[in-house]
Amino acid sequence: MHKESSQTCYKLELRNRILKAAMTEFLHKGVKSVKMDDIANALAISKRTLYEIYSNKEELLLEAVRIHEEEFNDHMVQYSQNKNHSVMDIIIEFYKKKLLAIADVSPLFLVELRKYKQVVAYLEQLNAERHNNALLFFRRGVREGFFRSDINFDIILKTSSASADYAMETQMYKEYSITTIMHNTIFLYLRGICTTKGIKELDAAIAE
């Protein structure tokens, strides 16, 4: 029994190490150039051991992306549950975390993700859930006086998403960093939907 428990703990630990190492490689180098051999070598494990846990790169990529997104969601849920944090605190934290997370990400990673059907399906479902949650969040912001009441937030969310897609499709990242692109699109939309009260808090947060 103790032996089985030890083996289970080892496999869980190894799985976590693989996910962490793989995601680091994917984020910095893109997906295509990272081979399963590279990940096995980085962890000093055999390729056979790696394939016993993940049968192919897409399976590994999917779980790595899922864990990455769940960690972000968990952070935002915990942050949002703090009663001292206003709507503006929450949305600023959301975009600050996004900007920090993407600062060192290779544009190739974002482009090449779209070539993996299972990952695309997962992200589409995740984005649909986030879209619905964002609509509820913006309505709360209207009630609290931070966001304008004359805005169609469904349109705002869809056009901001389309702007991000356009930046990737036209390879704008070759001219500007991903962080710069986000800062000049997302914060433009965000400032535009704010009331005077919201703008004051937004400007104060950006100045920090």
Specify the residue positions occupied by each region the protein language model found.
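C-terminal peripheral helix-coil segments that are non-catalytic and often amphipathic
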Residues: 1-3, 136-140, 144, 173-208
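Short linear capping/connector segments at secondary-structure termini
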Residues: 110-118, 204-207
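Short, basic, alpha-helical segments at the C-terminal edge of helix-turn-helix-like DNA-binding modules
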Residues: 66-73
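Basic, helix-initiating cap at the start of DNA-binding domains
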Residues: 1-29, 33-45, 59-62
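Short hydrophobic/aromatic patch on the recognition helix
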Residues: 44-54
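Hydrophobic alpha-helical connector segments
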Residues: 63, 77-104, 157-160
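Amphipathic alpha-helical packing segments from all-alpha helical-bundle domains
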Residues: 119-146, 153-164, 169
